[in-house]
A protein has these predicted regions:
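Conserved, structured core segments of small domains
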Residues: 1-90
């Protein structure tokens, strides 16, 4: 078993009626972080209460959230980062 330290960004939903108009800029931001190798995965919770994203560093998670159009325009009401020890076979 191998372990890697990851940082999980949790979003709580805010005004979801603003999501569609801000999604193109949000998508461009997460695609940039994926290209840079800083963002490993992301997605919403099925109950629409929020979403989560997994980053390689705390700094990347903070940088992402602070500049995310979803945060800046109220689609997200609150965000937090938690350290996670990812265990994988091998």
């Amino acid at each position: 078993m191998t372990e890697a330290l990851r940082y999980v960004l949790f979003y709580e939903s805010g005004n979801l009626s603003l999501a569609a108009e801000n999604f193109p800029a949000h998508r461009a931001r997460y695609e940039e972080f994926m290209r840079r190798g800083l963002l490993l995965s992301l997605g919403p919770f099925s109950d629409r209460s929020g979403s989560m994203a997994v980053f390689t560093t705390r700094e990347a998670a903070e940088e992402f959230a602070s500049g995310d159009p979803f945060v800046q325009h109220g689609v997200v009401s609150k965000w937090t980062i938690r350290e996670w020890r990812e265990a994988t076979p091998g």
